Swiss-Prot record:
Residues 10-285 form the Deacetylase sirtuin-type domain. It is found in: Cytoplasm. 2 residues (Tyr-94 and Arg-97) present in a large hydrophobic pocket are probably involved in substrate specificity. They are important for deacylation activity, but dispensable for deacetylation activity. NAD-dependent lysine deacetylase that specifically removes acetyl groups on target proteins. Also acts as a protein-lysine deacylase by mediating protein desuccinylation and de-2-hydroxyisobutyrylation. Modulates the activities of several proteins which are inactive in their acylated form. Catalyzes deacetylation and de-2-hydroxyisobutyrylation of Eno at 'Lys-326' and 'Lys-343', respectively, thereby promoting the enolase activity. GO terms for cellular component: cytoplasm. This is NAD-dependent protein deacylase. Belongs to the sirtuin family. Class III subfamily. It catalyses: N(6)-acetyl-L-lysyl-[protein] + NAD(+) + H2O = 2''-O-acetyl-ADP-D-ribose + nicotinamide + L-lysyl-[protein]; N(6)-succinyl-L-lysyl-[protein] + NAD(+) + H2O = 2''-O-succinyl-ADP-D-ribose + nicotinamide + L-lysyl-[protein]; N(6)-(2-hydroxyisobutanoyl)-L-lysyl-[protein] + NAD(+) + H2O = 2''-O-(2-hydroxyisobutanoyl)-ADP-D-ribose + nicotinamide + L-lysyl-[protein]. It comes from Proteus mirabilis (strain HI4320). Its EC number is 2.3.1.286. InterPro entries: DHS-like_NAD/FAD-binding_dom, NAD-dep_sirtuin_deacylases, Sirtuin, Sirtuin_cat_small_dom_sf, Sirtuin_class_III, Ssirtuin_cat_dom.
């Protein structure tokens, strides 16, 4: 008799646990289904940013009308050959930029914050921010899904192993890596002219799936980034240029808005929110 009662008790407990598990699974299924349906209605957006978005934050573009960077030839401070000729000069050049970036006055502007809000709304599966900038203002504004195709100023790299390290101080020719059997001198984690940009496979994959491509603060004279708009159009994406003035590839864009980045980007993102929330709206309008 006792064995029978114990058996019934175990059976009730088993059924209760099974019922709770079924209920949990059902709730989880409907939650995921709802989330998927919501995400399916969101556009896939790729954003490209250039120096123009950070100019209002006090970041110098460095390139003057005569082609010099802070009175240095580009060939001397932004090429592998220049680094091999005079590594001390190159380190000094980027040390100055690194110090400037970390000044308290250098902060994100409304354009950076607007893009962070857009990413938060769309979710990482529907949003990729590709930047040509080597500053960290997108991160400071709250953006997460960022691809720095030209590297990052606050990082250094071992040229032998390819490992990347955080670095906020000055870098000298006597700073070596600790990741190799025979340590190599660390170099700025910057993509110089003549080197392959970072993450190109991921970028082209995102462009092939994009519904909307937005270029912000770009000049249109540096490839391969200048060709992204063409790639996006080939797969049917709507293309938008938000710039202080027309870029060299402005004819490739279907929609254009010109003015300070802090104004035109914020205004366009708010417009985009309205379009997304209107089921009858057309993103191309």
């Amino acid at each position: 008799m006792m064995k029978l009662k114990l058996r019934h008790r175990r059976l009730r407990k088993f059924r209760k646990i099974k019922s709770l598990r079924r209920q949990h699974s059902r709730c989880r299924y409907f939650h995921l289904t709802h989330k998927t349906e919501h995400e399916m209605n969101l556009p896939k957006v790729v954003v490209l940013t250039g120096a123009g978005i950070s100019a209002e934050s006090g970041i110098k573009t460095f390139r003057s009308e005569d082609g010099l960077w802070e009175e240095h030839r580009v060939e001397d401070v932004a090429t592998p050959e220049g680094y091999h000729r005079n590594p001390k000069l190159v380190q000094q050049f980027y040390n100055e930029r690194r110090r400037q970036l970390q000044q308290p006055s250098i902060q994100p502007n409304e354009a950076h914050y607007a893009l962070a809000k857009l990413e938060q709304y769309l979710g990482k599966d529907n949003f990729l921010l590709v930047t040509q900038n080597i500053d960290n203002l997108h991160e400071k504004a709250g953006s997460k899904h960022i691809l720095h195709m030209h590297g990052e100023l606050l990082k250094v790299r071992c040229p032998q192993s390819g490992q990347v390290f955080e670095w906020k101080g000055d870098l000298s020719t006597t700073d070596y890596c600790h990741c190799c059997q025979f340590p190599s001198p660390l170099r700025p984690h910057i993509v110089w002219f003549g080197e392959m940009p970072i993450g190109m496979d991921e970028i082209y994959h995102a462009l092939a799936q994009a519904d909307l491509f937005i270029a912000i603060g770009t000049s249109g004279n540096v490839y391969p980034a200048a060709g992204f708009v063409h790639e996006a159009r080939l797969t049917g994406a709507h293309t938008v240029e938000l710039n202080l003035e027309p870029s060299l590839v402005e004819s490739e864009f279907e929609e254009k808005h010109y003015g300070p980045a802090s104004q035109v980007v914020d205004a366009y993102v708010h417009k985009l929110f309205d379009l997304i929330n209107d089921p009858k709206a057309d993103l191309t309008q």
